[in-house]
Amino acid sequence: MSESGKTVTRVDLCEAVYQKVGLSRTESAAFVELVLKEITDCLEKGETVKLSSFGSFMVRKKGERIGRNPKTGTEVPISPRRVMVFKPSAILKQRINNGAAAKTNGDVAKVAAG
């Protein structure tokens, strides 16, 4: 969850495309769905999706391993599986950290002024 407590949904993304691009609401929703479907299809095939200045979505294979049942302590085999990971770009990391620093500095300035 974000610091503001807001979670951005598909509907929010569609509305942003509608407001900023000028497509109709129907076209905006179709556009967002198409982009998400394309990303999903690529990941299903095991392809990496790299979005410049944003980050990369990748599928990694996890091998079989032994886990433990936390209640009983007995060992349980965990089947091999594929997991999706997201690696943010350096630009995105910097923007997130600078944004957090700016908010923190703004709060400090408000407290000092108050």
Curated annotation (Swiss-Prot):
Alphabetic keyword roster: DNA recombination, DNA-binding, Transcription, Transcription regulation, Translation regulation
InterPro entries, A to Z: Hist_DNA-bd, Histone-like_DNA-bd_CS, IHF-like_DNA-bd_dom_sf, IHF_alpha
Entry's Gene Ontology molecular function annotations: DNA binding; structural constituent of chromatin
Family matches, as Gene3D superfamilies: IHF-like DNA-binding proteins (4.10.520.10)
GO cellular component: cytosol
SUPFAM superfamilies xrefs: IHF-like DNA-binding proteins
SMART domains according to UniProt: BHL
Assembly: Heterodimer of an alpha and a beta chain.
Function: This protein is one of the two subunits of integration host factor, a specific DNA-binding protein that functions in genetic recombination as well as in transcriptional and translational control.
UniProt record similarity statement: Belongs to the bacterial histone-like protein family.
Protein's name according to its UniProt entry: Integration host factor subunit alpha
Organism phylogeny: Bacteria, Pseudomonadati, Pseudomonadota, Alphaproteobacteria, Hyphomicrobiales
